[in-house]
């Protein structure tokens, strides 16, 4: 239900047509769904690297408060991607 409200706000602020506002809102929803799925796959694995004497390690490190400067043409999509 909030999707339409967010889409309308994007349309007003970014001077877009409503279908573009809805598309951008759906894009952020899809990004959040994808990130939620990725969080379930974080096991703290240690893997070999292609670089000699290096290893890859999955570590969960919350960032805390984050600021984001977004482009005018895709304000919500850029913000959503920054959250992930």
Region spans (language model):
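N-terminal Rossmann-like NAD(P)+-binding subdomain of aldehyde/semialdehyde dehydrogenases
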Residues: 1-54, 84
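Conserved small-residue-rich beta-alpha loop and adjacent elements
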Residues: 45-84
């Amino acid at each position: 239900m909030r999707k339409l409200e967010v889409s309308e706000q994007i349309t007003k602020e970014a001077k877009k047509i409503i279908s573009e506002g809805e598309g951008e809102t759906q894009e952020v929803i899809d990004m959040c769904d994808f990130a939620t799925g990725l969080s379930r796959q974080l096991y703290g694995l240690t893997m070999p690297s292609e670089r000699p004497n290096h290893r890859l390690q999955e570590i969960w490190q919350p960032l805390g408060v984050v600021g984001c400067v977004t482009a005018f043409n895709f304000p919500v999509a850029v913000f959503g991607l920054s959250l992930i």
